Amino acid sequence: SISQNIKDNLLTPNNLLQAEPKLLLQDFVSDPHNYISILSAIAKGAHVVKEIVASTGLASGHVSKYLSVLKDSGFVERRIPLTLKKNSRAGRYHITDPYLRFYFRFLETRQEQLALGIQDQALAEIKKHLIDFIGTYTWEEICREWTIRAGAKEELPYLPDQVGSTWNAEAQVDVVGYNSMEKTLILGE
């Protein structure tokens, strides 16, 4: 089962996958502590600088600097609503790697417990939130990738030249495929 695989492969003490995120960060920065705090905040739903500042307690200027390093090194990306210009201030930060996203959402804050072999609480928390976690991030990404491929295979009424998502204060659309020449779009939620 997925629960048993998570327990056996991710929650065991001294697991190489447990060390991977910090080892990766250390390749880019000498002191990963604040970067880890920012990645944990993003993984738990803080996607704009203001939310990340509130979650981490770091100064806004420092958060912006750290986010720039994380973005340049490929750990995070800044997504803009597809309907807005690239320099829009409405961008949201997301962790690019699915495993790192999972690690910083579920495992980072439980390192001491896991090192002592205390797995049940972590597993219960993961089970409780896994479906929402997959739906919120992984499933949406798969759907956006499908939109690109389906357009290329002519399985859609047109070929989207841009695929992403869009949002404002009231609503979010998870999948938007837009053809700028034909001024057509497909929406998926």
Name each model-derived stretch.
Residues S1-F104:
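Interdomain hinge/linker elements that couple catalytic modules in large macromolecular machines
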Residues G91-E189:
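A cross-kingdom feature that marks ATP-driven nucleic-acid transaction machinery
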